[in-house]
Amino acid sequence: MSRRVVRQSKFRHVFGQAAKADQAYEDIRVSKVTWDSAFCAVNPKFLAIIVEAGGGGAFIVLPLAKTGRVDKNYPLVTGHTGPVLDIDWCPHNDNVIASASDDTTVMVWQIPDYTPVRNITEPVITLEGHSKRVGILSWHPTARNVLLSAGGDNVIIIWNVGTGEVLLSLDDIHPDVIHSVCWNSNGSLLATTCKDKTLRIIDPRKSQVVAERFAAHEGMRPMRAVFTRLGHIFTTGFTRMSQRELGLWDPNNFEEPVALQEMDTSNGVLLPFYDPDSSIVYLCGKGDSSIRYFEITDEPPFVHYLNTFSSKEPQRGMGFMPKRGLDVSKCEIARFYKLHERKCEPIVMTVPRKSDLFQDDLYPDTPGPEPALEADEWLSGQDAEPVLISLKEGYVPPKHREFRVTKRNILDVRPPASPRRSQSASEAPLSQQHTLETLLEEMKALRERVQAQEERITALENMLCELVDGTD
């Protein structure tokens, strides 16, 4: 009598659970634009969602704690003249977010810690270089102020948003529309998928294709690709018969896939969200009502199905919280923000554990908010892995950091770097001055809000008087 051997994995019993109704974000008009991006971005401080807006594109930014019904007059981030197609939080500053639009521009915004009283309309910087709509954004994982954008002009531009300069422009690699772009862990390589059905590995600083695979998935529908911790490329796509499919590839040998699995028949593009700490990939399809997740290992069959979280309502987009934003006391290993037609619903993935102690095996050190390189260091050829932090004591977001743009003058000579010194008592007034400026900004915003409310009350009182006079 043979006995079936069950594969041992600490993630075998991961289960998903939707948040209670009072923990959702209600009455949000999620964008109806047809585009295969996530429409949602989240970090440990804020939730951003692309929304419907008249007269151009907009997105809403909410503090994570602001759950419940969102007022219809809640301030938006506006400035684009066309629909917003993608948004992405800076991994090194939780108050900075980039947006890409149908209007061919990329804008970078500074979000205040306090709730603004009116729409945010002035970006810190506008990046203009594409000739057609911009639909893909991705910040460099380790270099400060380095942002990638990809447009309908088949061009990838890598920017230094601190100066507004174009660092690199990859304009002769893709012959057709780019479907996805992903950095590897240290930002030395890119994985891209294209309408020509080719998966490419690119060295951006050399503008060279390191490896490529034609028809990684044979269908005509869009592919997606992400790097894994082991250096493989995980892809989602479609078969020739329009079945959804996932694949795992070794970029050193693209001849045959490491793994290739057919999924189901559906038109929705599968968006992969990969967690390198656990090596779990979560697949979320637009229009689906489920999240399927797989563990990627170096043992056959290499891509191991774990489970499926199912709900009743289809998803219109999905946000994925960075690991440092999770609640380690509850053994969360992932948290999603599912977009419905009129709301956003958190979904938590948990590993059941009996002990209340910190689970070291679930939470290895993870990338923190500090960059490992400056933009010019990366451009010169340096590489560095992310600066890791421990989650043992729980992650506390740093205080608000100002994002500044410096227009570099080519005649300027950069002074030599001064040796680092520890913070002394003489530096304390600078910190106090920054705190005072922040408080003054918040007081000004509160005064403006009170004035606006008083004007609204006066208008309502006048309307009431007119109604009373009309009934006499």
Curated annotation (Swiss-Prot):
GO molecular function, one term: actin filament binding
Start-end of each WD repeat: 79-119, 129-169, 173-212, 216-259, 264-304
Residues forming coiled coils: 430-469
Keyword annotations from UniProtKB, A to Z: Coiled coil, Repeat, WD repeat
SMART domains, alphabetized: DUF1899 (SM01166), DUF1900 (SM01167), WD40 (SM00320)
Pfam families: DUF1899, WD40, WD40_4
Sequence ranges of Low complexity compositional bias: 419-429
Organism: Rattus norvegicus
GO biological process: actin filament organization; cell migration
Region (Disordered): 409-434
Protein name: Coronin-6
Gene for this chain: Coro6
